């Protein structure tokens, strides 16, 4: 009998009703799924009924068990099974060579990092994952809610994020000490490129830095947070143009407004650079 290992954050989901609800949340046109931490293979078994699976299991003991349990699927290519850390695969270039949908019961200690990696991965079409409820609320929060943060903006940037349902600790073996929730992110927009939200990865990374500044102190006003890095006069002008109160707080804006503020500050910065380079050229003459 295989026991859950604490250092891998293992809690095996074995409730039939919950497993079925996760399957029902997967888009009907999905052809390729990536599963992280398949564990004993209960969810894997159900996913294989609808499409092919690429699974990453870091535990060598479970990897061997899964290889035996799904020997037929591995042999015919319906299941690609790797004994590897999925985060390392993302760092190396990606968890799949083709477009995919992520479905997983994620280990709590790396859930946020894995979701952000999937959000950044242009091959990922979306995800249905189970995580700690506290983290789920941060990703699925709506503008105006106190939990609304940079995580919610990134989760909704390319589409939508919603909390589907909560899962009792009794649905797992062993039962975790927290309540879990299943969230769904469905991407509908292109992230990078000419028709994308950002022209390239460099600009996207700058946007993420901008969000860190904006939410540096959530209880302070957005103006106060941004003025630590940007010109106060330009911020006042921009807020007036967008009809934003100087007293507005970071969680009270929506994704579109954050994109507008970022775009305007980027254009102001580029204008300043052009003016500086022009004045330097004049001095040299």
From Swiss-Prot:
SMART domains: rADc. Keywords: Cytoplasm, Methyltransferase, RNA-binding, rRNA processing, S-adenosyl-L-methionine, Transferase. Belongs to the class I-like SAM-binding methyltransferase superfamily. rRNA adenine N(6)-methyltransferase family. RsmA subfamily. It catalyses: adenosine(1518)/adenosine(1519) in 16S rRNA + 4 S-adenosyl-L-methionine = N(6)-dimethyladenosine(1518)/N(6)-dimethyladenosine(1519) in 16S rRNA + 4 S-adenosyl-L-homocysteine + 4 H(+). GO terms for molecular function: 16S rRNA (adenine(1518)-N(6)/adenine(1519)-N(6))-dimethyltransferase activity; RNA binding. Gene3D superfamilies: Ribosomal RNA adenine dimethylase-like, domain 2, Vaccinia Virus protein VP39. Specifically dimethylates two adjacent adenosines (A1518 and A1519) in the loop of a conserved hairpin near the 3'-end of 16S rRNA in the 30S particle. May play a critical role in biogenesis of 30S subunits. HAMAP family: 16SrRNA_methyltr_A. S-adenosyl-L-methionine binds at residues 11, 13, 37, 57, 85, 105. It is an enzyme of class 2 (transferase). Its EC number is 2.1.1.182. This is Ribosomal RNA small subunit methyltransferase A. It is found in: Cytoplasm. SUPFAM superfamilies: S-adenosyl-L-methionine-dependent methyltransferases. The gene is rsmA. GO terms for cellular component: cytosol. InterPro entries: KsgA/Erm (IPR001737), rRNA_Ade_diMease-like_C (IPR023165), rRNA_Ade_Mease_Trfase_CS (IPR020596), rRNA_Ade_methylase_Trfase_N (IPR020598), rRNA_adenine_dimethylase (IPR011530), SAM-dependent_MTases_sf (IPR029063). It comes from Campylobacter curvus (strain 525.92).
């Amino acid at each position: 009998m295989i026991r859950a290992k604490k250092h891998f954050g293992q809690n095996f989901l074995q409730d039939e009703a919950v497993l079925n609800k996760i399957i029902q949340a997967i888009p009907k046109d999905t052809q390729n799924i990536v599963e992280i931490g398949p564990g004993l293979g209960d969810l894997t078994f159900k996913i294989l009924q609808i499409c092919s699976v690429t699974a990453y299991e870091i535990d060598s003991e479970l990897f061997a068990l899964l290889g035996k349990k799904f020997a037929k699927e591995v042999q015919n290519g319906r299941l690609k099974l790797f004994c590897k850390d999925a985060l390392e695969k993302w760092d190396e270039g990606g968890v799949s060579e083709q477009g995919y949908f992520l479905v997983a019961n994620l280990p709590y200690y790396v859930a946020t990092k894995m979701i952000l990696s999937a959000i950044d991965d242009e091959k990922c079409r979306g995800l249905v994952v189970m995580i700690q409820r506290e983290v789920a609320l941060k990703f699925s929060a709506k503008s105006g809610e106190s939990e609304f943060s940079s995580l919610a903006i990134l989760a909704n940037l390319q589409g939508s994020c919603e909390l589907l349902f909560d899962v009792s600790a009794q649905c797992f073996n062993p039962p975790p000490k927290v309540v879990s929730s299943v969230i769904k992110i469905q991407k509908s927009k292109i992230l990078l490129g000419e028709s994308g939200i950002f022209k390239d990865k460099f600009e996207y990374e700058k946007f993420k830095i901008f969000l860190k500044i904006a939410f540096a102190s959530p209880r302070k006003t957005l103006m106060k947070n941004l003025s630590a890095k940007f010109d106060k006069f330009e911020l006042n002008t921009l807020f007036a143009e967008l009809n934003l109160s100087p007293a507005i707080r970071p969680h009270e804006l929506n994704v579109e407004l954050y994109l507008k503020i970022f775009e305007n500050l980027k254009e102001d910065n580029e204008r300043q650079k052009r003016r500086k380079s022009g004045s330097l050229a004049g001095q040299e003459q």
